[in-house]
């Protein structure tokens, strides 16, 4: 197996994600992330937010753990504007999941306990919802998994804590690719391969991206196929056979 540097793998993936319909946005730090969030929420909600109004939105978002934030993401926020009128801010259009703003960025640096630079992030309406961690070909997937654990420990909560809105992680070394929901306690056992309708595993990053990371599909996974389990306060993402079974019932 040829060893492919992580950088090449990352650049190719970013290009591919753009061709699938994610707009590329350069975000290097939290300030840029916050500025982009404002413009994307304005676009999604077809309104303008003053700095004061946006500060209220940020305050509303910066609460709770991963589970509580998953709920905030799915609810609308009632905002009283400076002129006294009231509007609802939608963070995620769950009913028409294709009708959201889709972006991709890479190499975002966040500084918490330690400084971390993340590989590839998918943003929906400016919210970082999918984190993709890559290791060069030939390296163990567990390394990428452990890397995501370090990010969560060291820097996801920094600043306005926007990275705590991550719903799904994707880890890949190019030839093997898995996905899993974001939770407080993570186990490598809870990472899954995606499959096609005939239950054939899709392991290659390129094929996985085409099937799973296409904007409408990844948005549908987040909106419809992540279950917020109240009892354990965890996010549960459906596995392929559960996904196809549910889709068949709906059809």
What are the roles of these predicted feature ranges?
Residues 2-251:
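ATP-dependent helicase/translocase motor core
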